[in-house]
């Protein structure tokens, strides 16, 4: 086997001053340790022979230690090496002057003397020490605790760990096409937000986010919907909004099949299945799916309402509530039902309305099995079973299931009626009452009975009507007449008792129903809010207008099954049917004579008077 000549210069690496200054302390320490170990490995082969040239057996290679140029390295090695730089003329004698064992017995300190070659007049010598590790495995890996005899082996082993880590980091970095994207991603992990809004002080991790945020202050909304004209700050918001018009719902839940327009809605929906509610209120312990829900909920405890309407001064917990409220003033209803053409203030109202057409009631009570269109309806319904009424009026102490019920109730005390009809000027406590009232003017009756086809303005009226086709549980003990509701029986019994608890302050006239008093008071005020568009005639009641309109149309929807005679009013049919049945429920107290209708009894009593 040929002899190979290896010098220390072959295995040494030199840095320029500029390169050295670029290294951090850890890299300098690593450089020092590796160079010392390389030198140790070479010198440990034969300490007593000349370091200049040593020929070994044929099985070994030949090493030569010549021209130890450590001028750069000499300034950086361990202080244990008492050395200020060997020049090109230094020759190592390789004499072992002494050995000192460390206290732990882990290292051997070898003192080596190197003498400079004679120059013109003098020679000098320099002494340094070298720490050589023993055969014990002194170097332990911090990652896996594996032991090594030599530092170089440990360094190589640790490099393997680092390569594994770096491959993961590179994988992560490769998800970003450009360096700025990686920097922005790092800011997400560190929480750094260097870009601050001068208007409100809010900080952002990206300049693009800051630019979009500043549009809130400038009210700039460059992205406009061609369908409804609504404008948005971001293009992504417009894209999501357009799905309201197209009906596109690309995000489908694999568990229940429900689809969503927005990815965020889909993510939140999945928490319904998992039951995850990571955000808990410290005041009452209530938990929420969203962090923003917790923030809004905490405003209930604090009473904070940061969003105020400039038109009427009303304040709201949520910005979205203010947006919807402002549409009450502007009359804007951008969300239109494709089935019936009805328009709504917000998308959630449209979604809930569409369930009327589909009959979908996805929220079911586990106590009684009752189903609901809205999740909030189920929440309020559950309080019927539990008896919980968390919202209490400070004026009268009355408690309510929902906060909206409390707000509406408080308007009774304040007299506030913010919802005004543009047709007749009548004002209402809540928007729902106004919507139902407007159907009187439009003639709209969206709630139809499947049994007989009769339609109603309110779903409550339809519910009451449907009970007519079913059982009548409430019977009058006086005359045997049965009723669907207990309240109907109560009002009916007042006919027998003569009780009229609702009294007019103007003329002292009394009434059985509160609604009768309200309608009567319009006589004193001269108010007739229901006007016929055909002839201009006005009426106190909406029902009177409906009956009057049949005069123009000739419609007589109430037909007698006995004789086939038809009537414009249901009350006329009821009175007519008493001719066939012979029923006379109204009795004169003075003479005992019976009559078919109250007007006949009234005329008769005048004879006695």
From Swiss-Prot:
Keyword Zinc: yes
Family the entry assigns: Belongs to the krueppel C2H2-type zinc-finger protein family.
Swiss-Prot/TrEMBL keywords: DNA-binding, Metal-binding, Nucleus, Repeat, Transcription, Transcription regulation, Zinc, Zinc-finger
UniProt xrefs under InterPro entries: KRAB (IPR001909), KRAB_dom_sf (IPR036051), Znf_C2H2_sf (IPR036236), Znf_C2H2_type (IPR013087)
GO BP: regulation of transcription by RNA polymerase II
Source domain of life: Eukaryota
Lineage, opening ranks: Eukaryota, Metazoa, Chordata, Craniata, Vertebrata
Name of the protein this chain belongs to: Zinc finger protein 571
GO molecular function: DNA-binding transcription factor activity, RNA polymerase II-specific; RNA polymerase II cis-regulatory region sequence-specific DNA binding; zinc ion binding
First and last residues of each zinc finger (C2H2-type): 139-161, 164-189, 195-217, 223-245, 251-273, 279-301, 307-329, 335-357, 363-385, 391-413, 419-441, 447-469, 474-496, 502-524, 530-552, 558-580, 586-608
Organism: Homo sapiens
One Pfam match: zf-C2H2
KRAB domain ranges (all copies): 6-84
Function text: May be involved in transcriptional regulation.
GO cellular component, as recorded: nucleus
Intracellular or extracellular location(s): Nucleus
